[in-house]
């Protein structure tokens, strides 16, 4: 009998890297047919994996190790000046948990966000089915967190996975016209606060990539731990 903790893995064909120019990327995927649950997934996340929809993967590139799994140890986190400012500026926002299901209001915000922040990124022409397949897994405890202002206007949505040792920031999208609010920063700060309230030690942020503007911002959250050489350690940027 196959052990509950055993997985089969598959390597993807090489493809152009989405984050670094002139680089080729390959991913290691957990068997999509294997039964997955919060305990198994949490174990894989601690080993540097992440999910997109129901597919659980981690980068496994032959000549590059730029993608570093990253997490915030919430008990040690101390916001910097700009993060404190973003938190204070957004105190008029309310957060509400919603189940993962299609809402036209969410999808419209998702499309506007991608069209402005990531045009020609491969997702800005997503259909409702594409959107749900990207956000939902079908096997994990995922919530959509709505952030609304005092006029009940939807400004941001964060998809968050529950793990046995933390929260995993799956994806977030927000009003591209609300630049002064620094909503991307605020959402991560909210997730840190929520993990603390739930007595969970970590917020997992996916991958930190030093030379990618899309991914390097994560090192602004101190301390940041990265998974290297089969262990988590505090990132020391050089």
Swiss-Prot record:
It comes from the Bacteria. It catalyses: N-terminal L-glutamyl-[protein] + L-leucyl-tRNA(Leu) = N-terminal L-leucyl-L-glutamyl-[protein] + tRNA(Leu) + H(+); N-terminal L-aspartyl-[protein] + L-leucyl-tRNA(Leu) = N-terminal L-leucyl-L-aspartyl-[protein] + tRNA(Leu) + H(+). Keywords: Acyltransferase, Cytoplasm, Transferase. Its EC number is 2.3.2.29. GO terms for molecular function: arginyl-tRNA--protein transferase activity; leucyl-tRNA--protein transferase activity. It is an enzyme of class 2 (transferase). Pfam families: ATE_C (PF04377), ATE_N (PF04376). Its main location: cytoplasm. GO terms for cellular component: cytoplasm. Signal peptide: none annotated. InterPro entries: Acyl_CoA_acyltransferase (IPR016181), Asp_Glu_LeuTrfase (IPR017138), N-end_Aminoacyl_Trfase (IPR030700), N-end_Aminoacyl_Trfase_C (IPR007472), N-end_Aminoacyl_Trfase_N (IPR007471). It is found in: Cytoplasm. Functions in the N-end rule pathway of protein degradation where it conjugates Leu from its aminoacyl-tRNA to the N-termini of proteins containing an N-terminal aspartate or glutamate. Belongs to the R-transferase family. Bpt subfamily. This is Aspartate/glutamate leucyltransferase. It comes from Nitrosococcus oceani (strain ATCC 19707 / BCRC 17464 / JCM 30415 / NCIMB 11848 / C-107).
